[in-house]
Amino acid sequence: MRVAIYPGSFDPITEGHLDIIKRASKVFDEVIVSVLVNPDKKGLFSIEERVKLIEKVTEDIDNVKAESFEGLLVDYMKEKDAKVIIKGLRVVSDFEYELQMAHMNKKLDSSIETVFMMTNAKYSYLSSSSIKQVVMFGGCIEGLVPNKIIKDIINKIGKVR
């Protein structure tokens, strides 16, 4: 069974993330969307909320599940018997950073491969940070995040403001 891990903060998940998930689900037997627990980074959504949002937007994709993890990605991958890391690339600067991470992960575990997937051009400008800013200033996020979670995001940002 070919298990792939799609790690990230997903704070919140965007249409760009979902596009990568859908495409990866056609290539791998199982895709685990893994929310990284980073104690140094305070997100808008809690880790549990992010996992629930991912579950909500991927509920119709049978071979996708969402989890959280803490620690080294390579250790988590061993636990899940996964050999592939999926990374979405929007721009060249994403590649430069992700290439360094891929080399580090390969150094830590030579059996791990990183698969880079180009983001659909229509999502190349999207980031979770930009979504939060648009909502904070009263803008519309339709088409930027999955429709199923628009209200969740607006409600959360409304409470934080």
Swiss-Prot record:
InterPro entries linked to this entry: Cyt_trans-like (IPR004821), PPAT (IPR001980), Rossmann-like_a/b/a_fold (IPR014729)
Enzyme Commission identifier(s): 2.7.7.3
Pfam families registered for this protein in UniProt: CTP_transf_like
Compartments in which it is found: Cytoplasm
Family recorded in the similarity comment: Belongs to the bacterial CoaD family.
Main location (coarse class): cytoplasm
Site positions (Transition state stabilizer): 17
Protein name (Swiss-Prot/TrEMBL): Phosphopantetheine adenylyltransferase
Cofactor(s) needed: Mg(2+)
Keyword Cytoplasm tagged: yes
Function: Reversibly transfers an adenylyl group from ATP to 4'-phosphopantetheine, yielding dephospho-CoA (dPCoA) and pyrophosphate.
List of residues binding substrate: 9, 41, 73, 87
Taxonomic lineage of the native organism: Bacteria, Bacillati, Bacillota, Clostridia, Eubacteriales
Gene Ontology cellular-component annotations: cytoplasm
Catalysis performed (reactions): (R)-4'-phosphopantetheine + ATP + H(+) = 3'-dephospho-CoA + diphosphate
Residues that coordinate or bind ATP: 9-10, 17, 88-90, 98, 123-129
Subunit comment: Homohexamer.
GO BP annotation list: coenzyme A biosynthetic process
Top-level lineage group: Bacteria
